[in-house]
Every structure is written in C-alpha cells, then in structure tokens.
C-alpha cells in the first residue's frame, strides 16, 4: 500500500464537509437588521414621597409624574409621557449624466512618378494609399428614487436629555388575518416644536428612525427561497 492510496480516502471526508458547509452557508437565512433597537416603550418610575415640613408652600418637591401645572400647557416633559408623531416623509432624488465623443481622421499617400523598373508592381495607381478612420462614443445614465411615508404613531418619552429635549420611542402592531405589521419609531424631539394638540411632524424630529416591517405568509412570499439563495451564493457570475 502506497502513501497516495492512504491520503485519498482521508481527503474525501474533508471535501464532503467543505461542500456541506458551502451548501449550508448558501441556504442560510439573511436576517433583517432592525433600524429601531432597544425597548419600544418606557414606564415612569415610582415617585418618592417627601414628608411635609408644616409650610403651605413646599420649597422642594419630588418629581411627581401625575402633576400638571395650572398655568402651563400639558406638554410631555417626563419619562412615560405620550406624544403623537405625524409621519410626513417624502424624499425624492434624481440624477442624470451623459457624455459624447467623436473623432474623425483621414490620410492619403501617393507617388506621382514611378520608376521604370517599378512600373510593373506599382503601376496603374498601385502606389496610392488612402485611409479613413471614424470613432464615435455616446453614453447616458440616470437614476430616480421616490419614497413616501405618511401616517401617525403615538410614542412615549424614554429619556429626558440634559438640554430638555425628549428621546421618544414607540411601536405599533397591526394584525391582519395571518400577518402582522410593525411600525417602529425613535428620535429626539424638541419640546418647542410640539403643537397644542400634543403632536409633532416627523420632519422636525432629530435622529429619526422609522421602520415598517411585517411577518406572515405575505412577507415570506417576498423572500428568496433557500435553493435560490444556494445557487446565488455558489454562482461565480
């Protein structure tokens, strides 16, 4: 028994294992990266009760999430307060480019007098040379993109920043037959942009993250099958 006959059986399991790994990699499901991460709601903490000091006016009051001033509007200001976001996203972009190039050239060569000993091979205008060349190029490209998102979603205040801005987050789930639609939103809201009906347009929200996804048989129909993913990953083209 030579060494080659021993090495070949050892290589076959490794080759089969490598093919199996490639097949599993090609059939693997590509997960969806979430735009809105972390918890999608916030609950206010328990208030700390302070003992009365016998005065009518309490100089130091603990944070009371149910307290609303008499002469101020009822805008969200604490963790757990709700706020309505009016989704008004409309993004449109277009780009076009074109290029043209042309080049023409011609050349003529001739011998007016042909020597006598060259009259045979070069006679009858055989010494004349005429060349013409033309090169044309034309290129054109364009791209258009339009995105529109409208609707409303009520979010909660998850964090009050040091400058008074509100970090809001929220989620809405809609179940229709055998599918569920998820709308998630997060961003930073300036309290000055909140209107009297406790709403703010999404165009005035900083660091806005809007996610609209779903699951169910409709969403599965939009995904590529495992066999198609396999051939797409192993194909060199």
Swiss-Prot record:
The keyword Zinc does not apply. Residues 1-26 form the signal peptide. Keywords: Bacterial flagellum, Cell outer membrane, Lipoprotein, Membrane, Palmitate, Signal. InterPro entries: Flag_Lring (IPR000527). GO terms for molecular function: cytoskeletal motor activity. The keyword Signal applies. It holds the Pfam family FlgH. A lipid is attached at residue 27 (N-palmitoyl cysteine). A lipid is attached at residue 27 (S-diacylglycerol cysteine). It is found in: Cell outer membrane; Bacterial flagellum basal body. It is a lipid-anchor. GO terms for biological process: bacterial-type flagellum-dependent cell motility. Its main location: membrane. HAMAP family: FlgH. Assembles around the rod to form the L-ring and probably protects the motor/basal body from shearing forces during rotation. The basal body constitutes a major portion of the flagellar organelle and consists of four rings (L,P,S, and M) mounted on a central rod. Belongs to the FlgH family. PANTHER family: FLAGELLAR L-RING PROTEIN. This is Flagellar L-ring protein. The gene is flgH.
